[in-house]
Amino acid sequence: MKKWVVKIGTSILRGNEDQSTEQVIESLCKSLTSFIFKGNKVILVTSGAVGLGCKKLNLNTRPKELSALQAVAAVGQVNLMTLYEKTMKKLGHNIAQILITKTDFDSRESFNNASKTFQKLIDLNVIPIVNENDSIANEELKYGDNDTLSALVALAINANKLILLTDIENLYSKDPRNNEDAHPIKEVNSNQLKIIKDKNIQNYNNEWGTGGITTKLIAAEIATKGGVEVQLADGRNENNLINIFNEKKIGTIFHPVDKPVGNKKSWLSHAIKTVGQITLDEGACLAIEQKGASLLVVGVKEVEGDFTVNQAVRIVNTNKKEVAKGITSMSSDSLKRILNKKENINSSMIVVHRDVLALT
């Protein structure tokens, strides 16, 4: 049995002159059904609420004001789920709507609860349809794109693959719209992905969506570090999803790392909410990055913010570049007293244990 996550973007769902939104959803649902009938499980992460809301309200441009975006999303989400429910019912499937904000994943307990809900739904042969809760999320609580959200969902259910359906055929070396010498990149390993993402070689932003290729590279990094293969493909071609379900090498495939960090550390790296920051000296950075060591108090140079035991912090080097995140065994007050020489230093005291420390 395969357990896959499929993410479809706004640019596909809005349709075009040749294919309406209703036809796009019908084709998508038929493809998902064919995969499920073979004994597989699937979760759909869908964008489109704002785009469909604009269409319903006859708005020619995407609103910029947050309250207007939230209102339009509320209108569009109803339309979006009605289309999915109507289509899937004809095909003999039940669906469930799951709307998520960052707070639903920022603690281990809530992440586990979400994982259990997803698993129970697919065990009941229900297709979970996930979207960010754009109608209530403010800027602080938003992922801002469903690419990142889809990667976290893939981690939550220990998926085998994440499929990102978008409006480009492949990852390219350059933006093909502006560079005739751009060439497609068919396969990407973990080392190549880091280089490509860090260089940020391209960014196909569009009017209706909030993503672009950069967010897809970030999603690919999150998923592949957790052991999930990612395949990016052109969702405008209705045959592509069926071909991917049949293991065809279409678009760009991002291969998972050789040694996945696992569900828990992936969550630590990408979903947890941090409340403080710890700066390390060079020796401590090398110890946690190269030796997988716990963070000891002797390696701490500076403490910022207020946090208690069992809260999450960013861990940075002396240049303030983030190297890890972790859950502390000591409060900020205790650490500051030690740094200010008001308490004796026991160099073996653990600040963040390696079991709850994840490199970023």
Curated annotation (Swiss-Prot):
It comes from the Bacteria. Residues 275-348 form the PUA domain. SMART domains: PUA (SM00359). The keyword 4Fe-4S does not apply. ATP binds at residues 7, 166-167, 210-216. GO terms for cellular component: cytosol. Keywords: Amino-acid biosynthesis, ATP-binding, Cytoplasm, Kinase, Nucleotide-binding, Proline biosynthesis, Transferase. It catalyses: L-glutamate + ATP = L-glutamyl 5-phosphate + ADP. Pathway: Amino-acid biosynthesis; L-proline biosynthesis; L-glutamate 5-semialdehyde from L-glutamate: step 1/2. Gene3D superfamilies: Acetylglutamate kinase-like, PUA domain. The keyword Lipid metabolism does not apply. It holds the Pfam family PUA. Its EC number is 2.7.2.11. It is an enzyme of class 2 (transferase). GO terms for biological process: L-proline biosynthetic process. One of its GO terms (molecular function) is RNA binding. HAMAP family: ProB (MF_00456). PANTHER family: GLUTAMATE 5-KINASE (PTHR43654:SF3). Catalyzes the transfer of a phosphate group to glutamate to form L-glutamate 5-phosphate. Belongs to the glutamate 5-kinase family. This is Glutamate 5-kinase. The gene is proB.
